[in-house]
Amino acid sequence: MITYGSGDLLRADTEALVNTVNCVGVMGKGIALQFKRRYPEMFTAYEKACKRGEVTIGKMFVVDTGQLDGPKHIINFPTKKHWRAPSKLAYIDAGLIDLIRVIRELNIASVAVPPLGVGNGGLDWEDVEQRLVSAFQQLPDVDAVIYPPSGGSRAIEGVEGLRMTWGRAVILEAMRRYLQQRRAMEPWEDPAGISHLEIQKLMYFANEADPDLALDFTPGRYGPYSERVRHLLQGMEGAFTVGLGDGTARVLANQPISLTTKGTDAITDYLATDAAADRVSAAVDTVLRVIEGFEGPYGVELLASTHWVATREGAKEPATAAAAVRKWTKRKGRIYSDDRIGVALDRILMTA
């Protein structure tokens, strides 16, 4: 799946990060300099490889970070021969062939890619973007996050006149009431707000309760994921909610998103006056009943993932459900035991 990112690529929540480099061992400006400062051991390995003549056009130079938390691989993509020379589209074409090979061979599930050869390289973004999209269409199961050259944090536009809608109301009311319920069940969790991961799972169950929300969930790295939910949150950021920022924070950082005073007032007024208020409350009631006892990022991810394999893949027996959840990603296989998945499955079947 191809999506677009903004802000700091080095904070992208992906297994691999792509860095643009030359073939002479210099990382003196742009994103390459940021990588050099963030990963000095990677730079040392790259510099030595250049001296040995191992960094060439059309060949990725991959460095494993050795980190348990954060990106596992830095993929150095040569976009020019010398740092003084311009990039060429032929270099991008050759490199993308090898990048796809590397992603397949290393079984990389997600990757963040900068605007290759644009900016200091002198290439036109439209030409490069077309090539990136074409290349990653070969890998439909890989989450490819493409960063356009504009970069920077997302500007919050038009928030003063933001109108409450049914979809926004469901998110806000689910957030408000879930936070109250989570405080009672998991008092050690952040009291200020709830994470994007948790909101995604709340809205997954809301969509199950009322399919007219049409949120179009797909199997993501951390369970069912909806790009539309993210867009709804981004649209409310700075007005009804605060904490998402530009959306580039790592998912597992569990950065808290909370209702603003304006958001609290808006949802209170909506529920008191709008004809759809009962429908909003009914959807949220169902969500909170289903997830009771599974509050927190770990629990709601487990419950939503188990629900997905039970309803989409027909895994309604404990053994098959456990196998399906644990093979979803290596991470799920590490953190979720068969017993815990079985408990989640019991809840799903009980509330069906």
From Swiss-Prot:
Active site residues per record: K80 (nucleophile)
Applications: As expression of DarT is bactericidal (rather than bacteriostatic as are most TA systems in this bacteria), inactivation of DarG may be an attractive drug target.
UniProt GO molecular function: ADP-ribosyl-[dinitrogen reductase] hydrolase activity
Keyword Ligase: no
GO CC annotation, single: cytosol
Top-level taxon of the source organism: Bacteria
Positions annotated to bind ADP-D-ribose: 8-9, 20-22, 31-34, 79, 117-121
Domain Macro intervals: 1-155
UniProt comment concerning the protein's domains: The N-terminus macro domain alone is sufficient to neutralize DarT from non-cognate T.aquaticus in E.coli, DarT in M.bovis, and to de-ADP-ribosylate DNA in vitro. The C-terminus is a region interacting with the DarT toxin ssDNA binding region.
Similarity comment: family membership: Belongs to the DarG ADP-ribosyl glycohydrolase family.
Function statement: Antitoxin component of the hybrid type II/IV toxin-antitoxin (TA) system DarTG, which plays a crucial role in controlling bacterial growth and bacteriophage infection. Keeps the toxin molecules in check under normal growth conditions. De-ADP-ribosylates DNA (probably) modified on thymidine by its cognate toxin DarT, which neutralizes the activity of DarT. Experiments in which DarG levels are depleted lead to cell death; expression of wild-type DarG protein from M.tuberculosis or T.aquaticus restores growth.
Protein name: DNA ADP-ribosyl glycohydrolase
Upper classification of the organism: Bacteria, Bacillati, Actinomycetota, Actinomycetes, Mycobacteriales
Protein encoded by which gene: darG
